[in-house]
């Protein structure tokens, strides 16, 4: 069973996925990206950080399930990551997630969101300047227009509630 978790940057997708790992057994799909590694990120766990040339080589060799440009960097999911038994969770950028869900109805899409004030606070805490935050908020509002295309919508106002809602979704679908 493949779950795609998406939402605007800063809504807590990584935090939710990390907390899910304390409650359920799943394989997390590690994506490739060309963006610089943040201080708190771990190579091979959060992302595989690669060059533009390496990313293009993966595309040329048809190793990517999906890929998108976001914020001036590329993000992509290797095909090898979905060939797993059990529960697989993908953390994808909204455009890539939307395209992938349209091309494969077997995947389950979960859109994560938070209110604007909290999103701005999180972006500020990451050290972004006002111009960057303004651009991200415009992008977030554009991405939210796609939230109705997902199987589930989770408002992440409280981490435990959001995690429990996702666990409930996974358990319900596993029983079917």
Annotate each PLM feature.
Residues 5:
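Hydrophobic anchor at the beta1->P-loop junction of P-loop NTPases
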Residues 8:
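P-loop (Walker A) phosphate-binding loop of NTP-binding proteins
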Residues 11:
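ATP-binding Walker
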Residues 14:
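Walker A/P-loop
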Residues 22-30:
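Post-Walker A helix-loop "phosphate-sensing" segment adjacent to the P-loop in P-loop NTPases
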Residues 33-88, 95:
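ATP-dependent small-molecule kinase phosphotransfer cores
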Residues 89-92, 102-126, 155:
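Conserved phosphate-donor/acceptor-positioning beta-strand/loop module used by diverse small-molecule
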Residues 128-169:
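Small-molecule kinase domains that catalyze NTP-dependent phosphoryl transfer to phosphate-bearing small molecules
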């Amino acid at each position: 069973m493949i779950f795609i978790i998406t939402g605007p940057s800063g809504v807590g997708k990584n935090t939710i996925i990390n907390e899910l790992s304390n409650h359920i057994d799943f394989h997390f799909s590690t994506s490739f990206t060309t963006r610089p590694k943040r201080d708190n990120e771990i190579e091979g766990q959060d992302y595989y950080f690669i060059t533009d040339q390496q990313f293009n080589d993966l595309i040329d060799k048809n190793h990517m399930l999906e890929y998108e440009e976001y914020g001036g960097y590329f993000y992509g999911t290797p095909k090898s990551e979905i060939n797993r038994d059990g529960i697989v969770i993908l953390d994808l950028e909204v455009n890539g997630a939307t395209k992938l869900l349209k091309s494969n109805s077997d995947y389950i899409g979960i859109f994560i969101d938070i209110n604007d004030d909290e999103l701005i606070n999180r972006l500020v805490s990451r050290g972004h300047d006002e111009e960057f935050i303004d651009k991200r908020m415009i992008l977030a509002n554009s991405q939210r227009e796609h939230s109705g295309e997902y199987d589930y919508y989770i408002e992440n106002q409280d981490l435990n509630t959001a995690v429990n809602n996702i666990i409930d979704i996974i358990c319900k679908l596993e029983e079917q």
